[in-house]
């Protein structure tokens, strides 16, 4: 009989109708109904990677020249540092935390998100070109965190230590 506590990472991909999105939705629904020792943090994250450069942040940091930023791809996720802070908060307040926590920050287009990252890390070797593409993948949340620009500044400061 398992007595441990688990924080399950949810995702904005539950909106997708592919196998991954459907499986994440099924898992999330089951945990909400039956997972007494589990909390879900649903959000979308950006942050550094250890071994690849496929996520938005790492991909962008290694680009030069022109890159496209999608003006219709709306996002309101959090940095990995903010996600970790929220995990700590849930652990410290387990009994009063709802099973499902949906983190959200300000809505921002991927175009403006790239410009924000560029500004925060003073990246001058890339030009972000707006492209009208994408869809709204913002989440309706129940825990508002600080604006993404503040989070990105904190993230870069944290990793410069």
Regions found by a protein language model. Give the residues of each.
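Helix C-cap/helix->beta junction micro-motif
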Residues: 2, 34-35, 121
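Short aromatic-enriched loop/helix-cap "lid" or pocket-rim segments at secondary-structure transitions
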Residues: 50-55, 113-115, 139-140
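Mid/C-terminal beta-alpha module of Rossmann-like enzyme folds, strongest
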Residues: 84-136
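NAD(P)-dependent short-chain dehydrogenase/reductase
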Residues: 19-21, 25, 29-77, 82, ...
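Structural signature of the Rossmann-like NAD(P)-dependent dehydrogenase/reductase core
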Residues: 5-10, 39-42, 102
